[in-house]
């Protein structure tokens, strides 16, 4: 099988295109949070520890949610969690004491989505294209992440406007992907 066969099949082409948008939104948001970490109030080491702990919790939660509600609903629930964190940040970004809670919500939702897209990639494409599609999506998303440091350096609260827009775009695209395996 050739990569051309991946593109010629309407279902896999659709999954590849919509997954690419979801992955790009996800990875850009992931790195916006990573680069924005230096601006969070408090000790950067404690903030990094909190982010890592929230990642562990979100990875465990992602598997449970995916098993209970399926792919599309788990993508939407993780994006809603991330979007809620960014919306709360946009409204209360001047309240320094609650910002870490909003950032944790953003991080949990984003890390849940990261785990979900990695785990379910093999269900969106035939076996012979699973590795190729994974590589294509990883490459495209990380190329798009080049702009994340620029977004993170924008004045407050613009990075979280971009974060929220990415969540909404990914949420819309999640309705168009279909599992085939």
Predicted regions and their residues:
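C-terminal transmembrane bundle
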Residues: 23-26, 34-181
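Flexible cytoplasmic loops linking transmembrane helices in multi-pass membrane transporters
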Residues: 1-35
């Amino acid at each position: 099988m050739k990569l051309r066969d991946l593109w010629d099949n309407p279902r896999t082409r659709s999954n590849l295109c919509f997954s690419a948008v979801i992955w790009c939104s996800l990875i850009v948001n992931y790195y916006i949070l990573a680069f924005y970490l230096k601006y969070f109030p408090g000790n950067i080491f404690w903030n990094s520890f909190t982010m890592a702990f929230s990642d562990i919790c979100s990875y465990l939660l992602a598997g449970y949610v995916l098993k209970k509600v399926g792919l599309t609903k788990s993508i939407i629930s993780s994006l809603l969690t991330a979007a809620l964190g960014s919306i709360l940040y946009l409204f209360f970004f001047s309240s320094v004491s609650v910002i870490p809670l909003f950032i944790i919500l953003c991080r949990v939702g984003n890390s849940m989505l990261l785990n979900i897209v990695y785990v379910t990639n093999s269900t969106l494409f035939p076996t012979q294209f699973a590795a190729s599609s994974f590589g294509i999506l990883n490459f495209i998303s990380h190329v798009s992440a080049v702009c994340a440091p620029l977004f993170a350096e924008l004045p407050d609260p613009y990075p979280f406007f971009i974060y929220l827009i990415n969540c909404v775009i990914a949420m819309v695209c999640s309705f168009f992907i279909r599992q085939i395996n």
